[in-house]
């Protein structure tokens, strides 16, 4: 075969990392489009329609490709599908240990028949010999060495390489469940017991006078502080001092809060509820398990990869790190990263360690090699949702019903590798208060290593666990106080301008009270007593209950860095490129729709998972954005190419707000500096006596898009193809690339665009201009604008007067929230404990909705996932859990159609306050309140409270007995 070559015809752009030219390859997207091209253009175009003069999506823009089988996921590609690759596909299989208590002593493959022998076995000895290490983020011990005890259950021991499928399949069938394959020696202590905590956070706050003024003490006001570690546990200072350091003051006020709770409980002034809540280990159950395909082409010194990752940007840099040593050290000049559709993620494909095992296999393979988890392997090795143990106290003034204090000690099981556990612990702690205002709080979250499989950024990100506990406490303390839970909520609901547990003011209007009022008036709630009596009379052996819960989930990371580029062709076709991955949330569709606000038409093409195209902005990142000092930030910001963060990973709640921000700005700039002046030029030329008067078309805000055509002040509507041609002929802006940064506020800078200075919420901007015709270029030299596009085909604009959010905003931890509430009614079978969902109603505040149907889909999917978390899903810890390699859907119960009340679901999406409302990240919050609502509904039906999830039918039956 001919060796493949790397050129601009095959790859978009390149960047150089550690001497390796890295390419983000569009090949698989091109293949998907080629497949989709088999569908007639007329059929493909049916995803959009017009309603009252405005374009509306009928279904997702990849809908036709989906139902006709033309949408292909990364897991589906083989060597024969890849242009330039050898046709022979090799396969890899990872051996994993199911013992973390004994010294590993190796294995033998002598019993394998010759037809099932691997041609290469990669072990820890190879890694040591070749000096191969994992990227720092993932820790060490990529493969378990002989003579050591495993760090965790399911840890990789060896990788077997096969050059054909029959050999691979035969060997795997003989080895996968062979309990005697790996040999072990003497018993040892668990490795996790020798590790310090992954992270410890403490949020102490005491409000100022009446809660309206500056806090007496809080993380935002005073800063965060951390403990020392003694005997593998956090040890806090023992010298409280109200006038001392930040830590001494913090310990002083923590002591004051504890004393106030104790005293007020003793004198019966406050009702104090003390409870412990436990959540389980959850398998994310994405549609497609993780997969990798790779090949090193020695002839061209090119290392090819096909990855299914939510974070391909980080994969590029980390893969280069691995390739810098080992058998290919110095031999790889080009790294090609294909990022196709990943087949769902739920966070479990964000910074997963899996792709790096793929890189390792390809380093030693003699040809293309495929590493793909089956569902057993995904259960055993994939990222999990963290289990929490929360010991909490909630204190309420008996006379006013006002919450007086909240304390919690959270213990988080982070599994065998750190991954995002410190961040999950932090977010879980900040979410504890939910929608309620707490004048005093002391919330501690400590994450520990364990022998369980890794846990990571799974949907909910710690908030599902902590907010469920808070809602359960609200339910129970209302019961103790003998008050309606809505009355208790109304007395404590957080209002706009009040501070959270970190001392920060949440952004925007808080509409919690509005949602509570709507839910309280729902007929299911109003008639719950009569309905219970009626239902149980008509259905002997069944118990009826109603439950309600509300939650407000943060969205964002405090270091969001979206990018977008929009290009307008001379024919009026709109192309949008973004760095985001489509994970099933509808990003591809919503971003295509979003541009129509400014451009009057949907994007004709949306390219996802772009990485290297952003090289045109020449961005430089130097520091950790979470710990950078203000002085350092000010120093670096003077460089117009510097940014706190170059790129961000894709996650469920990030596209609607963060990605939309820069997409919207790019579209608006093309409108203001391209389409609008071009349209005015046409109107002046053809539809007005221009030499004798003025059209007064000076304000681009006068433009209106109707039926995809632009009109203004009564002038004839112009189609986008006509305007686009004129914009190109006039040398106007026809391409915009932008980058933004958000640390709970957007960075802003001035940019000079064709002589006009604009203040934009961007920190980098690059433009493309049309190739002006001499007929229209009367005030400038067309060649000058074309000559300015020297940065990968773009004119890179130097920013001025940059303003980044202050570094101390990191102490706010979160300030953007999206609320959701759920009301459920259930029936419980006394005989077997099975819960039937009779109905569910969800209220959601999503801000300005881009595509209503996508939001509705998130509501439905979130409800199903939340029901699974509450009633069905759960993995035992340790040796009986996922790490033993025997778990699959035959044992792990996910929500089925009969569990979720498919035809009994209702929802209310709150109307936006105005057209200027921001979109909100809602893809996680929609799964949270149903959990606590179900816990309360089960209590109302059975009079039994559950403090540990899941509430399986077996547990409910036993509790009722």
What positions do the PLM features span?
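N-terminal export signals
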Residues: 10-31
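Helix-loop-helix junctions that connect adjacent transmembrane helices in secondary transporters/permeases
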Residues: 209-324, 493-571, 808, 822, ...
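Thiamine diphosphate
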Residues: 327, 343-366, 370-372, 380, ...
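Short acidic, glycine/serine/threonine-rich loops at helix termini
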Residues: 132-136, 171-174, 316-318, 346-352, ...
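N-terminal secretory signal peptides
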Residues: 1-6, 10, 32-34
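Phosphate/diphosphate-binding loops
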Residues: 367-412, 661-687
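C-terminal catalytic domains of large/alpha subunits in multi-subunit enzymes
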Residues: 125, 326-333, 364-368, 425-459, ...
């Amino acid at each position: 075969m001919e060796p493949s070559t790397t050129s601009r015809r095959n790859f978009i752009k390149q960047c150089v990392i550690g001497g390796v030219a890295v390419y983000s390859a569009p090949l698989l997207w091109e293949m998907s489009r080629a497949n989709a091209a088999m569908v007639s253009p007329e059929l493909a175009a049916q995803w959009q329609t017009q309603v009252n003069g405005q374009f509306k999506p009928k279904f997702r823009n990849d809908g036709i490709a989906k139902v006709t089988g033309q949408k292909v996921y990364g897991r589906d590609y083989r060597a024969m599908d890849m242009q330039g690759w050898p046709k022979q596909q090799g396969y890899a299989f990872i051996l994993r240990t199911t013992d973390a208590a004994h010294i590993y002593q190796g294995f033998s493959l002598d019993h394998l028949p010759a037809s099932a022998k691997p041609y290469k076995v990669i072990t820890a000895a190879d890694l040591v010999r070749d000096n191969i290490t994992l990227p720092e983020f993932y820790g060490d011990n990529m493969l378990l060495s002989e003579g050591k005890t495993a760090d965790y259950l399911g840890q990789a021991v060896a990788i077997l390489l096969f050059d054909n499928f029959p050999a691979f399949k035969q060997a795997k069938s003989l080895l996968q469940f062979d309990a005697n394959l790996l040999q072990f020696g003497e018993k040892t202590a668990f490795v996790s017991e020798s590790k310090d905590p992954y992270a410890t956070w403490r949020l102490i706050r005491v409000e100022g006078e009446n809660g309206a003024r500056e806090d007496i003490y809080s993380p935002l006001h005073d800063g965060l502080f951390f403990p020392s570690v003694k005997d593998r546990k956090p040890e806090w200072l023992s010298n409280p001092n109200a006038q001392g350091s930040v830590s001494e003051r913090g310990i002083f006020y923590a002591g004051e809060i504890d004393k106030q709770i104790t005293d007020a409980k003793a004198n019966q002034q406050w009702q104090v509820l003390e409870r412990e809540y436990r959540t389980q280990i959850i398998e994310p159950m994405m549609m497609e398990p993780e997969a990798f395909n790779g090949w090193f082409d020695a002839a061209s010194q090119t290392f090819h990869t096909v990855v299914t990752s939510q974070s391909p940007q980080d994969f590029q840099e980390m893969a280069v790190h691995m390739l810098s040593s080992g058998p290919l050290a110095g031999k790889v000049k080009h790294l090609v990263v294909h990022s196709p559709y990943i087949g769902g993620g739920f966070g479990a494909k964000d910074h997963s360690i899996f792709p790096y095992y793929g890189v390792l296999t390809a380093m030693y393979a003699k040809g293309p090699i495929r590493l793909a988890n089956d569902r057993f392997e995904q259960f055993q090795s994939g990222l999990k949702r963290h289990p929490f143990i929360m010991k909490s106290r909630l204190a309420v003034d008996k006379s006013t019903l006002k919450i007086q204090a909240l304390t919690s000690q959270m213990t988080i099981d982070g599994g065998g590798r750190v991954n995002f556990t410190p961040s999950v612990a932090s977010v879980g702690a900040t979410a504890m208060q939910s929608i309620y205002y707490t004048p005093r709080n002391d919330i501690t979250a400590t994450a520990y290593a364990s022998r369980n499989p890794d846990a990571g950024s799974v949907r909910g990100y710690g908030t599902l666990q902590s907010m469920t506990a808070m809602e359960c406490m609200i339910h129970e303390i209302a019961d103790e106080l003998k008050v309606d839970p809505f009355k208790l909520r109304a007395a404590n609901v957080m209002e706009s301008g009040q501070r959270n547990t970190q001392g920060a003011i949440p952004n925007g209007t808080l509409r919690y009270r509005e949602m509570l009022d709507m839910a309280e008036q729902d007929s299911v709630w109003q008639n719950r007593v009569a309905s219970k009596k009626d239902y149980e009379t008509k259905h002997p052996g069944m118990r009826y209950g109603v439950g309600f819960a509300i939650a407000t989930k943060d969205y964002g990371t405090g270091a969001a860095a979206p990018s977008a580029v929009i290009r307008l062709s001379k024919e009026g076709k709109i192309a949008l490129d973004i760095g985001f991955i489509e994970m099933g949330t509808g990003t591809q569709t919503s971003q295509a729709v979003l541009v129509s606000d400014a451009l009057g038409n949907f994007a004709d093409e949306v390219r996802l998972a772009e990485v290297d195209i952003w090289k045109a902005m020449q961005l430089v990142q130097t520091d950790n954005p979470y710990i950078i000092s203000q002085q350092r930030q000010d120093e670096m910001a003077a460089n117009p190419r510097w940014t706190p963060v170059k790129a961000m990973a894709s996650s469920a709640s990030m596209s609607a707000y963060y990605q939309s921000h820069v997409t919207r700005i790019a579209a608006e700039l093309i409108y203001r500096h391209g389409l609008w002046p071009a349209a005015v030029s046409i109107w002046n030329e053809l539809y007005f006596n221009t030499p004798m008067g003025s059209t007064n078309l000076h304000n681009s805000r006068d433009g209106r898009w109707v039926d995809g055509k632009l009109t203004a002040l009564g002038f004839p509507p112009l189609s986008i193809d006509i305007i686009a041609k004129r914009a190109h002929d006039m040398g106007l802006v026809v391409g915009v690339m932008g980058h933004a940064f958000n640390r709970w506020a957007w960075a802003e800078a001035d940019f000079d665009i064709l002589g006009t200075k604009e203040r934009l919420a961007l920190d980098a901007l690059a433009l493309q201009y049309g190739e002006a015709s001499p007929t229209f270029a009367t005030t400038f030299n067309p060649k000058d604008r074309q000559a300015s596009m020297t940065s990968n085909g773009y004119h890179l604009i130097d920013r001025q007067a940059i303003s980044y959010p202050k570094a101390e905003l990191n102490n706010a931890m979160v300030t953007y929230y999206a609320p959701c509430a759920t009301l459920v009614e259930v029936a419980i079978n006394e005989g077997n404990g099975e819960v039937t969902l009779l109905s569910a109603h969800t209220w959601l505040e999503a801000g300005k909705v881009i595509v209503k149907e996508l939001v509705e889909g998130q509501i439905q999917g979130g409800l199903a996932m939340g029901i699974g978390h509450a009633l069905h899903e759960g993995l035992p810890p340790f040796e009986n859990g996922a790490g033993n390699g025997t778990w699959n859907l035959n044992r792990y119960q996910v929500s089925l159609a009969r569990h979720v009340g498919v035809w009994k679901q209702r929802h209310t999406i709150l109307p936006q306050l105005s057209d200027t409302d921001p979109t909100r990240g809602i893809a996680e919050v929609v799964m949270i309140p149903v959990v606590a609502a179900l816990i309360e509904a089960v209590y109302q039906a059975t009079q039994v409270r559950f403090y540990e999830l899941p509430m399986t039918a077996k547990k409910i039956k036993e509790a009722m007995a």
